């Protein structure tokens, strides 16, 4: 048996894993290419090297593979230049994660980091403003202009961000909730 699903589609493919480096994500250097179906030309899967308003998603200790996959899809949908994951985040190559990315895993570069605060400091040295999602953020998300280089820091489903990680952020933002909803599940 080669599938982990009950009713596989009967299709098998081999895909090379690409291992990105943080430096590639920050510099926008091509780490890989794909062919644009419309033009037939090879294009970088990391994006425009000259892009000034870079956007990153930093996630800490995400446990559910489906949630991580959803974050990849959301990252691609908003034009994220990369996703940075703490070393205790679920395996990006978990079959459920891969399925839930709906292919975004092949188009959005990503790295794992052993030192999330150290990585945040590297981003800050590269003039990237770090916004931490926090239930008790100092301001609501719509109080800021995100047109500059930005990274959004999202914590784990059950505990949110660790205090020391949240303290590394430049700003803490909240998303107002209606009703009795407390968070957006990561």
List the predicted regions and their residue ranges.
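Post-transcriptional modification and biogenesis factors for structured RNAs
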Residues: 1-186
